[in-house]
Amino acid sequence: MENTLIKSIYRDTPAYLNQELQISGWVRTLRVSKSFGFIEINDGSFFKGIQVVFEEDLNNFEEIAKVATGSSLIIKGLLVESPGAKQPFELKAQSIMIEGACSGDYPLQKKRHSFEYLRTIAHLRPRTNTFAAVFRVRSLVAYAIHKFFQDKGFVYIHTPIITGSDAEGAGEMFRVTTLDLDALPRTEEGRIDYAKDFFGKETNLTVSGQLNAETYCMAFRNVYTFGPTFRAENSNTARHAAEFWMIEPEIAFADLQDDMELAEEMMKYLISYVLEHAPEEMAFFNEFVDKTLFDRLDNIVNSDFGRLTYTEAIEILQKEKERFEFPVEWGADLQTEHERFLTEQIFKKPVFVVDYPKDIKAFYMRLNDDQKTVAAMDLLVPGVGEIIGGSQREERLDYLEKRMAELGLHKEDYSWYLDLRKYGGTRHAGYGLGFERVIMYLTGISNIRDVVAFPRTVKNADF
């Protein structure tokens, strides 16, 4: 007999009622009396499990009555309407086979475990309700990202993980080397001789696929990259991880306004997609993780996102500067408390802040006519602050070369990037969206370590 997925039973119950079925899955809970027992089984196909009823006429009743939480079972039985109010149906077991017994020291017992504890058993935490919901939503959002861009005709570009350039100009990168660390080759000046390394030069793990994506934007018009990125920031906060995924579209013949319109459309699409395709998981998050979740997401889907310049934002914030821990001054980056005040107290909806001072933004952003600001945008959302950062890219070769010189970037390291401006360059724009930040926002989970399967953070690379 073929296995029937629990998801199929929930989605098309009438087709399975009063039918003999076989299911397989893991024991979540077990309750036994003298002559019968109840097992909650989850098979991984659906957020909810199914109740299995077994009675003393089962040929291995005594064995099943002692089965441990976490054990895997194969069960044949008749699906019937449940007399209890807690579930619409149950499986009356005709046979139960133990596929894999579970040891008595199984860490996941029937009680609430803290997120901190569950991080220490990251290989087992997907078996809990919370993390089953988190990672199913993560899977759905990943699919929705591809669907959104593919339906709009974007081309998906696989950008390299190993790179010889720093896309952000920040320098906080993980080094890639095959050199013997106990006997490093040196140049005459005493520096490490990377000419003897695997690639013949200094290489790192990528912090962004943007620069590489721009090359394909100049051929395919609209492209996106979606993959892992790495930041060696010594930042041990709930929002930072050393390894995370980024969504980075690039659009040609486009300016900052086009960039913001794409970002707004994408955010609304992702939220609507998850609410439609993961209703059980989202209801769980709204009830047990963040009771304002549905209201917050509904506000995004049904709002026209606000717009204001960085200068206007500073003027608003300076009128309320006494309430902030960090100072508010033109030329300084906005802190999370500033961002949240703007989006939660002033606009009460998502808002784009545009035209930031050039000195706090990356070299590739287009210089505005005032010569002081660049065509950059950040999307701020209630509850989080900044969630997307983007810009119109500098398409003018002379402006780009001047900006690189100001920042001490070597033209030879970016010659291929400069070529894009020499050979038929166009106006183009793009943005970056941290995938984990989206999952946190969609689920209400407050720590990035709890939306990554095996988080990589400062002093932590377990599993």
Curated annotation (Swiss-Prot):
Enumerate the UniProt keywords alphabetically: Aminoacyl-tRNA synthetase, ATP-binding, Cytoplasm, Ligase, Nucleotide-binding, Protein biosynthesis
Q: Which Pfam families match?
A: tRNA-synt_2, tRNA_anti-codon
Entry EC number(s):
6.1.1.22
Q: What class of enzyme is it?
A: ligase
InterPro entries assigned to the protein according to its UniProt record, in alphabetical order: Aa-tRNA-synt_II, aa-tRNA-synth_II, aa-tRNA-synth_II/BPL/LPL, Asn-tRNA-ligase, Asp/Asn-tRNA-synth_IIb, NA-bd_OB-fold, NA-bd_OB_tRNA
One BP term from GO = asparaginyl-tRNA aminoacylation
Q: Which GO terms describe its molecular function?
A: asparagine-tRNA ligase activity; ATP binding; catalytic activity, acting on a protein; nucleic acid binding; transferase activity
Subcellular localization(s) per the UniProt record: Cytoplasm
What does the entry list under GO cellular component? Answer: cytoplasm
What reaction gets catalysed by this protein? tRNA(Asn) + L-asparagine + ATP = L-asparaginyl-tRNA(Asn) + AMP + diphosphate + H(+)
The record's listing under Gene3D superfamilies reads: Bira Bifunctional Protein, Domain 2, Nucleic acid-binding proteins
**Cross-referenced SUPFAM superfamilies:** Class II aaRS and biotin synthetases, Nucleic acid-binding proteins
Spell out the PROSITE patterns in the cross-references: AA_TRNA_LIGASE_II (PS50862)
Main location per the UniProt record:
cytoplasm
Q: How does it assemble?
A: Homodimer.
Q: Which family does it belong to?
A: Belongs to the class-II aminoacyl-tRNA synthetase family.
- Name the chain's protein: Asparagine--tRNA ligase
Q: What organism, scientifically named, is this protein from?
A: Desulfitobacterium hafniense (strain Y51)
Please name the taxonomic classification of the source: Bacteria, Bacillati, Bacillota, Clostridia, Eubacteriales
Protein's gene: asnS
